[in-house]
């Protein structure tokens, strides 16, 4: 082998070694860069998860956020849902009840589908998506709670006081009419009783609503419980029992709201709806009234100085010094109900308490009722509905009778 050949082989070997070193260096550099990117990504994720909160940002910007809660029974069937608005700046929460047979839109071009059917086919994600499409609002927090979790949470706050409007005697549940104290298992049995008795979906939702409202009243009236709400143990105990996308900083702010709540913290309303030709409970005016209801409640929750414009088709009702409705002392705020029941069917509008309530009657049937309870201590009540709903209707305010003209 001559010297030239040996030199070429040596150069080839050197080139190969240099190429291997270069490739190794590239891999090392790529590994370092990937490690840095992964490290930065982990830091950003940890910061976002443990320190960043949309509620904190909304508080700084004086904005309101939207959330949704889905309640599910032991048979994995929804009781119903609530669309909610929260202001972390003003410590106020507004919720609108959605019964399980309310029709929601998956697509505005298609027909609406009942909430319980959406849950049956696509689970809670399908329900939350339909609520977003129906309302046109981005839901920041999505929460699901089942019967066991309802029971555990009620036990954690020491129980809830309820007003029973009719005598109950079934299985392990036996109560006379009047105020009763429920532990978690009794509360769940009470909700089961409503299903067994065949209550309408909207009425079952009202009773669930009563549990929520009375739990809030219990917190308001118990300073010790309010302070307990700030403890890490109670936060972890309650939040571990719900399925949600709430993160630690969100939970901290939410429990601060509960720890500083008062009788004006929670505002509860019900969606206005009517049965369509398919037998589905459908938001009135193809959902536009629901969106307006949300916008008005958002302004109220955010304590904005300007109210939404009242158009010609809107009608307003102001009741001064309205307190104390017999049998409804567990209500914390005014409610605007769609019921469609005949007068006296549930006994909420008997002659004894008619003088303390405002009702709208159409064609001899009670269409809506405006009521507050003794606990709320509200001097001024403001309610609004759409004038187009009031064809052929009259308003009875106390013992006074008003015709509603177009």
Regions found by a protein language model. Give the residues of each.
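BRCT (BRCA1 C-terminal) domain core and associated BRCT-interaction motifs
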Residues: 342-404
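Entry/capping segment at the start of metal-dependent catalytic domains
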Residues: 2, 8-100
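Amphipathic, coiled-coil-like alpha-helical scaffolding segments used for oligomerization/assembly
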Residues: 121-178, 243-260, 265-268
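Second-shell loop/turn segments in exported
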Residues: 113-121, 135-141, 195-203, 223-224, ...
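C-terminal solvent-exposed extensions
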Residues: 71, 100-102, 111, 239-313, ...
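Extracytoplasmic/secreted envelope proteins and their assembly/folding machinery
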Residues: 80, 124-132, 147-151, 155, ...
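Flexible, polar/acidic helix-loop-strand segments at domain edges
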Residues: 155-242
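Extracytoplasmic
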Residues: 62-64, 77-81, 90-95, 110, ...
